Curated annotation (Swiss-Prot):
HAMAP family: Ribosomal_bL12. The lineage of its organism: Bacteria, Pseudomonadati, Pseudomonadota, Betaproteobacteria, Burkholderiales. Forms part of the ribosomal stalk which helps the ribosome interact with GTP-bound translation factors. Is thus essential for accurate translation. Pfam families: Ribosomal_L12 (PF00542), Ribosomal_L12_N (PF16320). It comes from Cupriavidus taiwanensis (strain DSM 17343 / BCRC 17206 / CCUG 44338 / CIP 107171 / LMG 19424 / R1). This is Large ribosomal subunit protein bL12. Homodimer. Part of the ribosomal stalk of the 50S ribosomal subunit. Forms a multimeric L10(L12)X complex, where L10 forms an elongated spine to which 2 to 4 L12 dimers bind in a sequential fashion. Binds GTP-bound translation factors. Transmembrane segments: none annotated.
Amino acid sequence: MAITKDDILEAVGAMSVMELNDLVKAFEEKFGVSAAAMAVAAAPGAAGAAAAEEQTEFNVILAEVGANKVGVIKAVREITGLGLKEAKDLVDGAPKPVKEGVDKAAAAEAKKKLEDAGAKVDVK
């Protein structure tokens, strides 16, 4: 019996974040592709209009851990809801995004928690 799209979607839906990460890496290696978002070239006139609009989605990026690594891991767990191992892996891999596509208030709150823990944070 052949595997259907629904079977695949059901299997992917049951995976944890770490399992999905491993799956993406396996796809990248097997097919020689990248899961990174492709940049779309903007029209010359659109660049000025885009700059005039206020940014509504922000990415909180852990730039440097600092001296209090344990405190930063606790802050990452609180912000993201990740398990201990996943949060430690994220902190060990800095610079890495902690939250992506969040509003300004959530980005500011996450930045404050991480900086209070001793980390250096960028919001983009």
